[in-house]
């Protein structure tokens, strides 16, 4: 068996996407990857508690240089942005070209780019009268939500749906 891909997950908030990744890894649904570190942009990110509970090493890195140092220390082969609310600097994108993926809560190209994150996306979808929404996983490039799309999953927007 080949060595597993070492994944660092960057977070800023509650960590629901992180928890989904932790659960999938624990269930054997991500057999080729292992989360080696969770790096948060804020000390109060609940995602840090989720990671600690799962036995995953954590760090808080507020500045780009700190993020790069933590990534290098982790030995990560790949980076997943799971609710990470900062734009990565060019140096990190260049160092990890085509090895950084983002989970975005809309069907790109709709409701993406600067200012579209979290509940703001869901609110805009509802206000736009959309009949479907979903999530997009894409590679990260120098733009905001402009990288190559890896996959999308559609879900219907139901009457009575809320941004929550």
Go through each PLM region and give its residues.
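One-carbon transfer enzymes
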Residues: 1-164
